[in-house]
Regions:
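Extracellular low-complexity, Gly/Ser/Thr-rich intrinsically disordered linkers
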Residues: 276-282
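Serine endopeptidase catalytic core focused on the charge-relay Asp
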Residues: 95-275
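Noncatalytic regulatory segments and standalone regulatory/sensor domains
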Residues: 1-126, 134
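Short non-domain terminal segments
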Residues: 76, 262-265, 280
Length: 282
């Protein structure tokens, strides 16, 4: 019988308390990289059973692991699910990318920096309340892995409509970004050009308007994503996808294409989901 969201949330809180008690000991086991709470996976399929998720670089058969280094199947009646740290290379989607030109600007469309041959996805627009200026929000790896600097141009989808040498696709200039070496975020913003400051909307293509996040008195979101929640995404290469959250605080290793080859970076506290539906772009 499928569990209700209330039942899953109750179990989630119980497991969070259990994790706080056992995480330190689990991390002492050789090969264990992280511990979190999420859904149990079986044969690459998710279930609605909540568990402690233990992440390792590489899973091994039990017979190859010294007895003192085996990860227990349960701790205090809480199920443990051992998983390899997810790895992904951006731009590896097997879908036909959407290189369409969109005006007004909106989330979920293709953009690229002047120095890059790779395209990425525009996430949404953000407002600098103090200055009244509008920026586009995207990933560091989309705009800054080819030697780009502040002030370098961003195009949508590209800069010129070949074969003419115009710059009609220029929409923004790189402004600032998360510290690639120390931050646990993959983000960057670019200031919209003067002709685009009022040529945008607060939507994500195929998903609709972005709604505000309500915070409590401590600044914590009132509604936070939890295991088994349904989430949606629209990427320029993946199209519109619908997925189920497996783990809202997972470690993930991501590979990015650069002019010097693929570069891999590890992140923690990331939302890990499984796609259950993908809408074709064409």
């Amino acid at each position: 019988m499928d569990k209700t969201r209330e039942q899953l949330l109750q179990r989630y809180e119980e497991l969070q308390q259990a994790k706080a008690k056992v995480e330190k000991d689990l991390l002492k086991i050789p090969g264990v990289a992280a511990v979190s709470v999420g859904l149990k996976e079986t044969n690459d399929s998710y279930t609605d059973e909540m568990c402690l998720r233990v992440y390792v670089e590489k899973k091994k058969p039990a017979k190859e692991i010294p007895e003192g280094e085996l990860i227990p199947r349960r701790i205090n009646n809480f199920l443990i699910d051992v998983n390899e740290i997810p790895k992904d290379v951006t731009g590896s989607a097997a879908f036909k990318p959407d290189y369409g030109k969109y005006r007004p600007l909106t989330g979920g469309i293709a953009i690229k920096s002047a120095r890059s041959k790779q395209f990425g996805t525009l996430g949404c627009m953000v407002l600098d309340v103090a200055e009244g200026e509008v920026f586009l929000l995207t990933n560091f790896h989309v705009l800054l892995t080819n030697g780009e600097e502040k002030g370098h141009d961003v195009g949508q989808p590209d800069f010129c409509c070949e074969p003419c040498p115009c710059r009609c696709g220029e929409i923004a200039r790189i402004e600032r970004w998360g510290d690639w070496d120390t931050d646990n975020v993959d983000c960057a913003i670019a200031l919209l050009t003067s002709d685009q400051q009022n040529n945008w909307n607060n939507d994500v293509l195929e998903l609709g308007p972005i709604r505000s996040i309500r915070l409590d008195d401590t600044g914590t979101p009132v509604h936070r994503v939890r295991p088994n929640d349904t989430v949606f995404k629209r990427g320029f290469s993946s199209g519109r996808t619908e997925g189920i959250v497996i783990d809202p605080t997972a470690p993930i290793t991501v590979g990015f294409h650069t002019k010097n080859g693929d570069v891999f970076k590890s992140f923690t506290d990331q939302i890990l989901s499984k796609i259950k539906y993908r809408k074709s772009l064409f």
